[in-house]
Structure formats: C-alpha cells, structure tokens
C-alpha cells in the first residue's frame, strides 16, 4: 500500500515532502520510502552478484551430464561433444584448483557451416550458467584500424556478465570464422595485414592471458575514459571455422584419402584423417596461435537423416517452432515423412548444414501463416509438394490462390 501522509520512512526517518513515496508493510506500522527501497534493491543485487562470482566445484556437472545436456540441443557430433565435455570439466577444475598447475586448454572447432559449432559453445555456457559472448573474427581488426578492436570481445563478455568482472573472468568466449583470418601464405608478410595475421596476434594476447583495459560501454578508448580491468587468464576461448581446404592439406601430408568433412571417397578407403597443428600452420594460422589451441575438435558433415532429426527432435527444433506459431492461429500443423525428407534433401544441396533447413521452409510457412487464421482451417498436413506451392495445402478449404 502506498501512503502520502505524515508517516515516516522506518529507515531514513524522512517524510513527505522530503520523499516522493512511502510504502507500508502489510499488517504493520512500518514504512519504506522509494529512495530507501531503491538502495535496498541495489544492495541485494550487489550481494547476489558477489555471491555468484565464486565458482563452486560442487555445482560442476560431470562430462557425461554435459554431453547429455548437449544431446538435447545438438544432433549427432558425439565425439565432438565428448571432447568438449571433458575439456570444459577440466577447465573449471583448473579454476577451482589454482595450485594444481593445470594449463588452460582452449578449443578449436573445425567443421562445415551449419554443423553446430556455435550452438555447442552457446549450450555449454547456458548449462554452466557462465557469461558467454560471440565474436566474428572477420569483423575484428588490430588496434588503430577501423573496425572492432579485439578487446571489444572482452567488452561483450563483460556486458553479458552485467559488468560483474569476476563472473566475466570465468566466462566463455566463442570466436567464429577464425579460418577467415588465416594469412595468405606461410611466409611472414612485410606489409600490414589488418584482417589476418595482425588479428591473430591481437587475439593471441588475450587468449594467452592478459589484463585487458576495456571501455565499459565498448567502442574506442578515450584518454579521459575510465577503463575496466579484466584478467583473461581464466576465460575459456573456443574458436571455430570451416577450414574448407584443410582436408587437402592433410591428404598431402598423409597420402591418405580423407572421409567425412571435406572428403572425397575413392574405392574402399575409409580412414579419417585427423588434423594436426602443422596442418593448421600450413593453412595460415600462426604457430603461436595454434599453440594456444591445444584441443582440436573435428565436427562431421550432416547427412540427410541427421538433418531430419534436427528438424524434429531438439529443444527449439524448427518444426516445433512452426507448430507453435500455427497453434497460435488455431491450426494443428503436421508434416508428412516425405515432406521432411524433401526439406532435408534441399538443405543438403545448399551445403549450409542445419542453417539451410529454415531457409527451405521459410517462404512456404510464411505464405501459409499470412492466410491465417481462418474459420474453416483447423489442421494442415504439410506434404513435400507444398514446399514450392504452399497454398495447395489450403485449396481443399476453398481458398483461391491470388494471381
């Protein structure tokens, strides 16, 4: 109950008109003013933040529990999920046991577009309830050049941590498209390389561990600006990329025809080539950068069966999302097996992995949703032929297609 009488705040003793509002405690002759309430809220928030900044090993899930959680969001990639789960558990054991002398194991994810690299990293952070930030390596530049300073990645993590520095310092950063900043040759360039080797050198500094001086709101540093210090030694860095020509480099080294991601099949040769640090250097990553990414995890290309499972099984699956949207319009949406197979087939042909699934369905779903709600449409069974002509699904309900 809000009061505007001569009653006083039980905390500061002030009354109207010194304060704008008094709130009465139910059933008691006690009051708190709006200003004291705001201070109390800030204090509670700060105490919760300080309590949450301490990472408790008791709350750390096992590697099997982490993989089981990832299984809910990412289809397939079992070996990659196992490797990630073990690496993450080891990383946070290291944080909880600083005297054990454990080295940080940052992670490199290699795999085609749409195989789940970003989703794996994001799901890990969500399960562990640690701050998480994503950066695109192609937008990063060396200090002094137009574009995002590498340290802006730390700013994003700090923002995700609601400016709790201690929480940010145990967070996870995912840098995508790392293969796009490979230098063009193994020889050292004599000219400035704004988007390649120079960015690798700048990233190397924060991955190795440094006390970054970052502007609290992002952007460029200014002489009069108060900076925030963030120690990056305990931040887990996961970097990812497609590395499309890596299989060729590995084949040249081993004389074995690779299978799986980037492979060409020939005869009965089925040995999978594992990428080595020397392959990454040959590709164009500088040796020092490769050395700070000791765990290399290879993701496999997705076949059509995996794409169908991605359509229907995970939390937030595309089919489930569309069924919810149609449900809001009073329509029960189902898909035939043939329709799912055709969507997966077309997505596979696009060579964009799981990302292609939504692109295949988007227009037909949009066209149908535009016509809803309708009193005579309570259910739709979506067939393969409707992908190119979605309004056919409504013709039996008497809808005439517009010209």
UniProtKB/Swiss-Prot annotation:
Any GO BP annotation: cell division
Which PROSITE patterns does this chain map to? Answer: CLPX_ZB (PS51902)
Keyword vocabulary terms for this entry: ATP-binding, Chaperone, Metal-binding, Nucleotide-binding, Zinc
According to the UniProt entry, where is the signal peptide?
A: none
Which SMART domains does the UniProt record give?
A: AAA, ClpB_D2-small, zf-C4_ClpX
Q: Which residues form the ClpX-type ZB domain?
A: 1-52
* Gene Ontology molecular function terms on file: ATP binding; ATP hydrolysis activity; ATP-dependent protein folding chaperone; protein dimerization activity; unfolded protein binding; zinc ion binding
Q: Which residues bind Zn(2+)?
A: 9, 12, 33, 36
One GO cellular component from the entry? HslUV protease complex
**Residues that bind ATP, according to the entry?**
112-119
Reported function: ATP-dependent specificity component of the Clp protease. It directs the protease to specific substrates. Can perform chaperone functions in the absence of ClpP.
Assembly behavior? Component of the ClpX-ClpP complex. Forms a hexameric ring that, in the presence of ATP, binds to fourteen ClpP subunits assembled into a disk-like structure with a central cavity, resembling the structure of eukaryotic proteasomes.
Family in the record: Belongs to the ClpX chaperone family.
What is the designated name of this protein?
ATP-dependent Clp protease ATP-binding subunit ClpX
What organism, scientifically named, is this protein from?
A: Deinococcus radiodurans (strain ATCC 13939 / DSM 20539 / JCM 16871 / CCUG 27074 / LMG 4051 / NBRC 15346 / NCIMB 9279 / VKM B-1422 / R1)
